Regions:
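Signature of exported/secreted
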Residues: 25-339
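C-terminal motif of bacterial Sec signal peptides marking the signal peptidase cleavage site
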Residues: 20-23
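Bacterial N-terminal signal peptides that target proteins for export
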Residues: 1-13
């Protein structure tokens, strides 16, 4: 009975801590590196962005962060205050990117103007914020002030945001004390802007000449609060080059594997995550890049991480269906060219 109570307390603890946080992502400072594999001699292609002054392109970026907890049995000993569900946020931002200038290294200064925004936040399945700039009734929401606002960034040919040049006017416009105003301000933070405009699939600029069949990689780490931290090596492989409407489209696919990168720091966080040590863990982390080699623009990039933990009562009262908690974390990012 004592062990059942401990399991119940663990379930309640998970809900209080895990679900009230969306987790965070820490991109490693190490740039993507190309791994050259033996193969037939072919002409390599340059996997890089190209920028032209005055050129304007519209993109849609979607990020999704979700944590969920589900009680996996009908065990009558389930804590009375247990309430599973999903906690997280999904953000969809449509913006124009107008190139203002370029330099001899291939970097560009780009003016970003927000055109549309959708923002959905949940806590244990309860919607805490739901905004859609296309809905007339949302016109008075402080988040609507973001529409039409601009900021300026420097972007490298390898798809990295090297500098946030100016976002002062946009930040001043959305300033306020309400929850929606603070959310709007957060969407203009350096961290969120960097994530929004970074193309994580491209190799480093000095290793961007790639043959079909070759691979390159980068490291990305995630913190899952009470479930600890994990690092992954994202391995990209250039699968093929297609001719589409007079354009050459490079297609690369990503498969990620657990990495020992930053092992010491990750071990400290993992050691404190006692719930993770009680669970079985499964995970999938995949992605796909479509890069227009002719125009030097990303057609589409998507990546999705899904990781699950299953904690089973080691001494179940009902041997045929032991009490269990299933916790799932989803982290996804996508960018697609609209026009």
């Amino acid at each position: 009975m004592k062990q059942i109570r401990i399991f119940g307390l663990a379930a309640s603890f998970v809900l209080c801590v895990l679900l009230l946080t969306a987790g965070c992502t820490k991109p490693a400072g190490k740039p993507a590196q190309t791994k050259v594999e033996p193969q037939e001699q072919k002409i390599p292609v340059k996997l890089a962005l190209k920028f032209t002054p005055a050129d304007s392109t519209t993109y849609k970026v979607t990020t999704d962060t979700d944590n969920s907890v589900i009680w996996e049995s009908a065990d009558p000993d389930k804590p009375k205050d247990f309430r599973g569900g999903h906690t997280g946020r999904k953000i969809e931002t449509t913006f124009t990117q107008q190139i203002q200038s370029t330099d001899d290294k291939g970097n560009a200064v780009a003016k970003i103007t927000i055109k549309q925004l959708k923002y959905l936040a949940k806590v244990k399945n309860d919607v805490t914020m739901d905004f859609d700039s296309s809905r007339q009734q949302d016109g008075q929401n402080p988040l609507s002030k973001l529409i039409g606002q601009s900021y300026t960034v420097q972007i490298t040919s390898s798809g990295q945001v090297s500098k946030l040049i100016d976002a002062n006017d946009a930040r001043a416009t959305v300033a306020g004390d309400s929850a929606a105003s603070k959310t709007a301000a957060n969407l203009l933070s350096l961290e969120v802007i960097t994530e929004r405009h970074t193309i994580p699939a491209l190799p480093a600029s000095d290793k961007n000449q790639v043959h079909t069949g070759e691979s390159w990689s980068s490291i990305k780490s995630f913190s899952f609060t009470m479930m600890g931290a994990k690092a992954y090596e994202k391995i990209y492989t250039l699968e093929e080059i297609k001719d589409v409407g007079g354009r050459r489209i490079a297609i690369a696919r990503m498969e990620a594997v657990p990495s020992a990168e930053n092992a010491r720091e990750l071990h400290k966080e993992q050691s404190a995550a006692f719930l993770a040590n009680m669970s079985d863990n499964t995970q999938t982390y995949t992605g796909e890049l479509k890069l227009d080699l002719t125009g030097g623009k990303v057609e589409e990039y998507r990546e999705n991480l899904t990781t699950e933990w299953l904690i089973v009562d080691p001494n179940p009262k009902n041997s045929t269906q032991p009490a269990a908690l299933k916790m799932t974390a989803v982290r996804s990012y996508s960018i697609e060219k609209i026009d």
